[in-house]
Design a protein with these regions (language model features):
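Extended amphipathic alpha-helical scaffolds
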Residues: 1-46, 50, 54-57, 234-353
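Amphipathic alpha-helical transducer elements in NTP-driven molecular machines
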Residues: 92, 126-130, 198, 202
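Glycine-rich, flexible beta-strand/loop modules in the N-terminal catalytic cores of phosphate-handling
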Residues: 26-117, 190, 201, 338-353
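Short, surface-exposed loop/turn segments at secondary-structure boundaries that line and modulate
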Residues: 67-81, 119-126, 225-248
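Mobile "lid/hinge" segments at catalytic clefts and subdomain interfaces of large enzymes
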Residues: 141-259
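Stable alpha-helical structural segments in soluble proteins, enriched in small hydrophobic residues
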Residues: 98, 128-140, 204, 211-212, ...
Length: 353
């Protein structure tokens, strides 16, 4: 078996990346280990674009296996794997949300990224899953604007980098911060905490940034040594007619519809309807590109107005929250309790018996 191994210090312990011919038909693969936790990541892309696809067909799977614990649980060992656990679903989403923004959204080739937990120790595999997926993609020929890194910052009495399950399962564990990003740009955050100060959150982010930078450099070194040359998937060209139609039909009403001051989405729906009618005579490919073009323009102006003018589409400033309302009871004397909570247009009724 051919192997090539790279290692670095990560949170005071060894992070190990191994390349073997175990999965040599995948376009990219690697084994990543941290303590006794080991994950395998594979990345594959179809040769041709998916017929009729008007979206980027990326699939991310996070697979847990019974054997990873080194135990046979229960009196009857089930040979079949069941549905994914909540933790597996959430870990898969962490990987997806981290890597997806770094693909060009005009790609129509099927891409699959599968992370399999081979061994589970005291370290959570979700951080390793992000790193393994990034390295598998980065060393493959699949076009991707990575690498991207991940780190967990915890706080008991002191801040800890990549705390173990034991360290996290204590009464005074105050903060669990998972940060993913690249080149001092963060594209995914998950945090669960008690009532910690803003200073603690900021310190955790600063610690995360330093670790992300170190792992970014580590990945870049690996990719420079063994990474394959990326293939090029040219961006489909938008017809000049689409630009002209946008200027005629959308430009005059664009800002008033996007920044309507209405917390609902009626105006945006109207904008999409007007645009869909304007491009209805175009072929399917140009219609798909035109819809992407509209969404890009909406995203662009929302980002610009939020940063430059501190303005949100519903009229709020960036430091304003939606109106809040809460009420106890008011449903019936028969039920034991009820509560109503509003945050803007989101209304929740909870009933207890």
């Amino acid at each position: 078996m051919k192997t090539e191994t790279f290692s670095t210090e990560f949170g005071g312990r060894e992070l190990r990346v191994e390349f073997t011919d175990l999965v040599d038909q995948a376009h990219g693969s690697c084994l990543v280990s941290y303590g006794d936790t080991v994950v395998l990541a594979t990345a594959v892309m179809s040769k041709e674009a998916k017929d009729g696809a008007d979206f980027f067909p990326l699939t991310v799977d996070f697979e847990e296996k019974f054997y990873a614990t080194g135990k046979i649980l229960g009196s009857r060992f089930q040979k079949r794997e069941g549905r994914p656990t909540d933790e597996a679903i959430l870990s898969g989403r962490i990987v997806d949300r981290t890597i997806r923004p770094l693909f060009d959204n005009w790609i129509r080739n099927d891409i699959q990224v599968v992370v399999t937990v081979l061994s589970i120790g005291e370290d959570d595999p979700d951080v390793l899953a992000v790193l393994a997926a990034s390295i598998a993609l980065g060393t493959s020929h699949i076009p991707w604007n990575g690498p991207v890194s991940a780190v967990r910052i915890g706080k008991n009495a002191e801040f800890e980098i990549n705390p173990t399950y034991t360290q996290r399962n204590t009464d005074n564990y105050q903060m669990d911060l998972l940060v993913c990003g690249k080149e001092k740009k963060i594209n995914m955050i998950e945090v669960g905490s008690s009532e910690v100060s803003e200073e603690d959150i900021l310190k955790g982010m600063e610690m995360a940034e330093k670790e992300l930078s170190k792992i970014q450099t580590f990945q870049e070194e690996i990719i420079s040594k063994i990474g394959k040359k990326k293939i090029s998937i040219p961006k489909p060209q938008l017809a000049d007619e689409v630009i002209t139609l946008f200027q005629e039909k959308i430009d005059p009403i664009f800002m008033s519809k996007v920044f309507s001051g209405n917390p609902g989405k009626d105006e945006l729906s109207q904008l999409v309807t007007i645009w869909s009618e304007a491009i209805a005579h175009l072929d399917d490919n140009q219609q798909s590109l035109a819809q992407d073009f509209l969404q890009e323009k909406i995203d662009e102006v929302i980002h610009h107005e939020s940063i430059a003018n501190q303005k949100r589409p519903d009229g709020r400033g960036v430091d304003e929250i939606r109106p809040l309302y809460a009420k106890v009871g008011g449903i019936s004397k028969i039920i034991h309790g009820a509560g109503t909570f509003y945050r803007g247009g989101t209304h929740v009724l909870s009933v207890l018996t």
